[in-house]
Design a protein with these regions (language model features):
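A cross-family detector of function-defining hotspots
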Residues: 31-35, 116-120, 272
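Structured N-terminal alpha/beta-domain signature
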Residues: 11-16, 25-27, 70, 114-115, ...
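A short, amphipathic edge element
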Residues: 24-26, 101-116, 160, 281
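Short, non-transmembrane alpha-helical segments in secretory-pathway proteins
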Residues: 3-18, 93-109
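N-terminal beta-strand motif that seeds the catalytic metal site of vicinal oxygen chelate
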Residues: 138
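Pepsin/retropepsin-fold aspartyl endopeptidases
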Residues: 41-44, 48-53, 77-79, 86-92, ...
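N-terminal mature ectodomain segment of secretory-pathway/periplasmic proteins
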Residues: 1-77, 208-211, 250
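Extended Lys/Arg-rich, glycine-bearing segments that form polyanion-binding/interaction patches
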Residues: 69-102
Length: 485
């Protein structure tokens, strides 16, 4: 085992040889082929921050790591966290690749470093360091002993090994690998890498602007009986109905509206999944106004079977991510307000707050169904009360006893829903007694099913995606809802 003086000397060599990339905003470009299509890849690093964008025919999706948590980003650059937890693995990967583990203050701020037995590769001995930044996972970095450059990242526990190959000078200041392999397979081959003088920017998404204070909007009453939150809106000079749908991962519009606005699909085929599946296109539509909130022009998925439901636009994750949206079911109103900056007061959420996570840009919360805790998607676009994925219900048939079945329809197709009721559902700090419950075959569910507007109609619900929570207020005098002591 090497002495601490030897380890310190190695860290100095590594910092000098690499040029300390953690001090710079680095932009890299590459390409990859998937499914017969070519994608332009752009990756950016700035200290521990990391951003990746994959683009084809002008449409991009991506990934973002803010130094603590990881986020997925959709076509409209809306980013939502993959988990509420700190991503310890990303922290350590970024600390090694950026050489932040060589920074003089790395151990002062809580990072841990120790040297393990050297490894032999093709007859050569390499130094092996166990590295764990503050709040990071433990990974091993393999260093070339003379220069100190990182040539590998290894996790025996996770059974993977990265190789950092083809090390080159970038802009005369830093040394970076141009090829990265995982378990022997090349996963990234950079064509260009450069230092950018401006800071790395986080994904912004669609930030609404407001003409005055928050405005209360009356819901539109549909011809059919429905608790769905549908409100009037305008886009491209057309007045249409918009559904506020937390079960939608972005934005959608009817084929009829796209044709009326004379906007053509671009970016190739897009797969739509609901009760069925089909392939459609994506259009770029102009700004949309709802109440006194205006969202900028954006990408919309075109749905050919949307208009019969009574609306032409579906406002999903993109409309919720950068605003506070209150759907007051008892009063049949919607209010959209600025989300506001996150500050120290957010460490103490209101008493009626319910934590949410996200799966495919859909909010998920844990609900107590009888005696079972079940993660369910909060889906304002689903007309049902509680709609379980059939596979989950088949594995847990004791949740409810079926009393009938009914045909259901949705985007992409039709199905059958087994129906019944359940004695009690715990949602946040409320018990809802004897709500309807069902299980639908072929339901493309997030979580283990959906809480729909048929259940949410007991409450005024404020969705605050930026704080990963919703806030519940029960309708006064509702005998089916009981506050939990």
């Amino acid at each position: 085992m090497k002495s601490s003086a030897s380890l310190d000397a190695l860290l100095v060599r590594a910092r000098i040889a690499s040029g300390a990339p953690y001090r710079y905003h680095i932009v890299s470009h590459s390409h990859e082929n998937r499914g017969g299509r070519t994608f332009d890849l752009t990756t950016e690093t700035d200290g521990l921050k990391y951003r990746a964008k994959s683009c084809s025919r002008g449409l991009c999706t991506g990934f973002y790591f803010d130094g603590d948590r990881s986020f997925d980003a959709n076509f409209n650059d809306t980013a939502l966290p993959l988990s509420a937890q700190v991503d310890g693995l990303q922290i350590t990967l970024r600390a090694i690749v950026s050489y932040e583990f060589t920074a003089p203050n790395f151990r002062i701020i809580g990072g841990q470093l120790s040297e393990r037995e050297p490894v032999l590769r093709e007859g050569r001995s390499y130094r092996r360091l166990a590295i764990a930044p503050f709040r990071g996972s433990l990974l091993d970095a393999i260093l070339e002993p003379k220069s100190g450059l990182v040539v590998g990242i290894v996790s025996d526990e996770r059974k993977y090994a990265f190789e950092l190959r083809d090390q080159r000078k970038v802009d005369g200041k830093i040394t970076l690998p141009y090829e990265i392999a995982l378990n022997g397979t090349v996963v990234e081959r950079f064509e260009r890498r450069a230092i950018e003088n401006t800071p790395l920017e986080e994904p912004v998404g669609l930030v609404p602007t407001f003409a005055g204070g928050p405005e209360t909007i009356a819901m539109t009453k549909l011809v059919r009986a429905s608790e769905q939150p549908v409100v009037p809106c305008s886009i491209g000079g057309e007045r249409v109905n918009c559904l506020l749908d937390t079960g939608n991962s972005g934005l959608s519009m009817s084929l009829e509206l796209a044709e009326k606005l004379r906007i053509e699909p671009r970016g190739g085929a897009f797969n739509v999944s609901g009760l069925g599946k089909y392939v459609t296109g994506i259009v770029h539509a102009p700004a949309l106004t709802i109440g006194n909130a205006t969202y900028p022009g954006a990408e919309y998925v075109v749905l050919h079977d949307l208009r019969p439901y009574g609306y032409d636009v579906v406002l999903g994750a993109d409309a919720f991510a950068r605003a506070r949206v209150t759907i007051d079911y008892p009063k049949h109103t919607v209010t959209i307000a600025p989300s506001g900056p996150i500050g120290p007061s957010d460490l103490f959420p209101p008493s009626n707050a319910v934590a949410i996570s996200f799966e495919n840009f859909i909010p998920i919360t844990t609900v107590r169904l009888g005696e079972q805790s079940v993660p369910l998607a909060i889906d304002t676009g689903d007309e049902s009360t509680i709609n379980l994925a059939y596979d989950y219900y088949a594995a847990h048939p004791d949740i409810f006893k079926p009393s009938g079945s009914t045909p259901v329809s949705g985007i992409g197709g039709t199905s059958d829903e087994i129906t019944g009721d359940i004695a009690r559902v715990r949602f946040g700090d409320y018990d809802v007694v004897h709500p309807k419950i069902g299980a639908t075959k072929s339901l493309a569910a997030n979580g283990k099913g959906h809480l729909g507007s048929g259940f949410l109609h007991h409450f005024a619900v404020t969705f605050d995606y930026g704080r990963s929570r919703l806030e519940l207020t029960a309708m006064p005098g509702d005998t089916n809802v009981r506050a939990v002591p």
